[in-house]
Amino acid sequence: MPKIRKAVIPAAGLGTRLLPATKAIPKEMLPLVNKPTIQYIVEEAVASGIKEILVIVSSKKEAIIDHFDYDFILENALLQKHKDQEHQEIKDIANLAHIYFVRQKHQHGLGDAILHAKSFVGNEDFAVLLGDDVVFGEQPALAQCIQAYEQTDCQVIGVQEVPHDQVNKYGIVTPEANWQKQALVKILGMVEKPAVNEAKSNLAILSRYILKPSIFTALKQVPFGVGGELQLTDGLNYCLQQGEPFFAKHFGGTRFDVGTKNGFIKANLYTALKTDAITKDEVLAILKEFA
């Protein structure tokens, strides 16, 4: 079985949930402490064995491209000021992986963004990571999905349980019977943002996928769906209906939806504590002062 070498990161969204901060700044460049969120996603991919990454961008996203490029003026300035650690950190960003970019000119949904990766992917199975979900843990979430792919030789979707009253915010999988507490379960169906009383489970599709090139054919066959957009979930369902097996991998780790204000704040606090940018006592003191 060939290794998963390539990953696609869609980053063309408008980030409307974080306006006005995202009016001129890509939401993917908003920082968790001192590192933009998309860098955490790229680092997860690299730590999972990915060698080549395609980032799908849109207009006003040049900052993402600049971030993963060399900056010789900045590097020289840091050297002259003997800031060796900062200099190395900046160089390391540009050397993380072979990173390419393509522009999605019109915002027609996640499925449309994935279609822009067809020539990059070729005939290889590949990974997809969405930038809204940052996951921290001992083992990268994507690496867990890749292991499940290697175990099953099937397409894999990363999932976690969400509260039952929030299933209408996610793509939800229909698992086979007796799925509770199983780390890997066969998928019978998928639906994008179902009504709370219609969801077959509370296993939410959460931004990590291992897919086969057949998804490109599927996305050409399905109509625009929820929100008037081309939904990746609909394309996955099409593949499922054609007899392609899928598995849901219940990945471990602490997940934050950094595309929301609440999740972004929580992720920053978590990152600050984990990197010793702030102590627990300092956080409690701040809460005592302002709460």
From Swiss-Prot:
Source domain of life: Bacteria
UniProt KW keywords: Nucleotidyltransferase, Transferase
Record Pfam families: NTP_transferase
Uppermost EC category: transferase
Claim: Metal-binding is one of the keywords in the record: no
Catalytically driven reaction(s): alpha-D-glucose 1-phosphate + UTP + H(+) = UDP-alpha-D-glucose + diphosphate
GO molecular function: UTP:glucose-1-phosphate uridylyltransferase activity
Classification via SUPFAM superfamilies: Nucleotide-diphospho-sugar transferases
Database matches in Gene3D superfamilies: Spore Coat Polysaccharide Biosynthesis Protein SpsA, Chain A (3.90.550.10)
Record-listed E.C. numbers: 2.7.7.9
GO biological process, one term: UDP-alpha-D-glucose metabolic process
Stated family: Belongs to the UDPGP type 2 family.
The protein's role, per its UniProt record: May play a role in stationary phase survival.
Protein name: UTP--glucose-1-phosphate uridylyltransferase
